[in-house]
């Protein structure tokens, strides 16, 4: 099993979360909420208001999201779903696990940091780096930039 950090439309309550729950794609089990240990720019950009984590470590904000344990089949599905490597790149980053853990999960004695895969954007229009940086994402958030799901495009 691999750990994947999701920060946008794949989180619980967001438009694409259903793909993580679909067993036909493989297995994905929620482990905990998490926060990046290093700042990154999380921006909302493009005509479909997509949340992008720009691969600019050290700039932006600490980003909150969710950590999932996924099997190889789900990881391959997510690569395809995220158009990796053409659009997103799957990289590794360190995430601090937060208090909201899965039922039955062991409580660590102290804050725990784990390495996770994340889908981020290494190449992007330069102006994206100047967009407002967010520390968390919600499609219905106060930013007013509602995500346009693939099925509506």
Curated annotation (Swiss-Prot):
A GO cellular-component term linked to this record? cytosol
Q: Give the GO molecular function terms.
A: gamma-glutamylaminecyclotransferase activity
- Keyword Lyase tagged: yes
Pfam families (UniProt xref): GGACT
Region (Disordered) residue spans: 130-153
Instruction: Write the Enzyme Commission number(s) for this entry.
Output: 4.3.2.8
Name the positions where substrate binds: 7-10
Keyword GTP-binding carried by entry: no
Active site annotated at which positions? 82 (proton acceptor)
InterPro entries per record: AIG2-like_dom (IPR009288), GGACT (IPR039126), GGCT-like (IPR013024), GGCT-like_sf (IPR036568)
Q: How does it assemble?
A: Monomer.
Which PANTHER family does this UniProt record tie to the protein? Answer: GAMMA-GLUTAMYLAMINECYCLOTRANSFERASE, TROPONIN C-AKIN-1 PROTEIN
What is the protein name given in its UniProt record? Answer: Gamma-glutamylaminecyclotransferase
Organism of this sequence: Homo sapiens (Human)
């Amino acid at each position: 099993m691999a750990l994947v950090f999701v920060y946008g439309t794949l989180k619980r309550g967001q438009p694409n979360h259903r793909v993580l729950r679909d067993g036909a794609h493989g297995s994905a089990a929620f482990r905990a909420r998490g926060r990046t240990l290093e700042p990154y720019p999380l921006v909302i950009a493009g005509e479909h208001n997509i949340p992008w984590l720009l691969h600019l470590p050290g700039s932006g904000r600490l980003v909150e999201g969710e950590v999932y344990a996924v099997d190889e089949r789900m990881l391959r599905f997510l690569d395809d779903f995220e158009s990796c490597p053409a659009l997103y790149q799957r990289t590794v980053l360190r995430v601090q696990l937060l208090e909201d853990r899965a039922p039955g999960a062991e409580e660590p004695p102290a804050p725990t940091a784990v390495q996770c895969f994340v889908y981020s954007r290494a190449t992007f229009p330069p102006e994206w780096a100047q967009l407002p940086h967010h520390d968390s994402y919600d499609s219905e958030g106060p930013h007013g930039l509602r995500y346009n799901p693939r099925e509506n495009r």
